[in-house]
Amino acid sequence: MQSRRAVCAAALCLAVVPAHAATGGSGAFRGFIESLRPDAAARGVSAATFDAAFRGVSGPDAAVLARIRQQSEFVRPVWDYLVGAVSDGRIVRGRARAAALAPTLAEIRNRYGVPAPVLLALWGIESDFGASAGSVPTVRALATLAEARHRGSLFRDELLAALTILQRGDVTPARMSGSWAGAMGQVQFLPSTYLAHAVDFDGDGRRDIWSSDSDSLASIAAYLKDLGWDPAVSWGYEVALPEGFDLSRYAADIDDFAKRGVRRTDGKPLPGHGRASLFLPGGSGAPVFLITDNFEVIRGYNTSDSYALAVGHLADRLDGGPPLAAPWPAAGARLDGPGLRELQSALAAGGFYEGPQDGRAGPRLREAVRRYQISADLPADGYATPALLSRIKDRSGSRP
């Protein structure tokens, strides 16, 4: 299935769009649009729907192309991201929405098994509870991305999916809007994700993620359920580790962590069942989390570790939980995009990393860092730092 993870991956490819594609004339752009007509018709899109969708779309969106070029090197530390994503104002607004929508949220949980705080947290981060759903016309944005990335099919397929939505009558071209990358409405679904997972919860005959709170929240819940959400466990917990804790044993049953002295920072007991793994997004001495498979489900919505952590922590705060107990590391103790690419290359040369050298942090790089740290008899926190990169380069003889 396509999801917003596809946008994250594709943005890196789009960052290298050739100049001639980014500045192509309107004639070439219109030619590209016309080339879509046979495939759209094969999907059941009528000529009238096709023409209505592209009425007034005479050329690519320059603002979208500018966002592509800005995207590639943008790496934000998790602690900076959390400041905005889990702000006091958002917590207040989210709790107010929770009270106003309590009956609807209860019905959605009964049907899909996803708790209200998680739904509200996702909704809050995606569109500030529906207040900031994005105003970029989806068809033009996707056409711009598809034409600029003509050798790839992702955005072309998403554009055809958007036309299918219009054909089905869930929304008009004028109301189909969202982000610059084609993610739509209050829940920021790509069109293919919408077709696969959006639901008509209020029963009005339309899956309306643009103006219906209940459809939006239920669509989030349906998507998480389809991604594998487990109603029996949380997303994770902030924990404190005992002195001398062996970080190399970072994945185990939750009760095993409890037996090894791991404790929740809020004083509540860990559950007695389920699997989990340690996540140290700021390295040793920063907040430590015990994350479950539901954390990975959230990453299915958006692959960013920072995003998944923000959703989980905001959900806890909306549910009355405390702020994080441990402080974050000092500014500068992290690698940016070019530094992460260099680290990926160095780890790959040593046989620790297999994967794209894309300058993106994530589970694959985290595991590679841990393997190196274990081999070097270092604390296996999985955290990529400038000091770690310098150590690897010094020992490999790659430093100039």
Short names for language-model regions:
Residues 4-8:
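N-terminal export leaders
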Residues 9-15:
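Bacterial N-terminal signal peptides
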Residues 19-23:
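Boundary at the C-terminal end of the N-terminal hydrophobic targeting segment
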Residues 28-51:
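Mature N-terminal segment immediately following signal peptide/propeptide cleavage
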Residues 45-273, 287-289, 298-337, 359, ...:
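Catalytic glycan-binding domains that act on GlcNAc-containing polysaccharides
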Residues 335-340, 345-392:
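Short acidic, glycine/serine/threonine-rich helix-capping segments at coil-helix boundaries
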Residues 392-400:
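Intrinsically disordered, low-complexity Ser/Thr-rich linker and spacer segments
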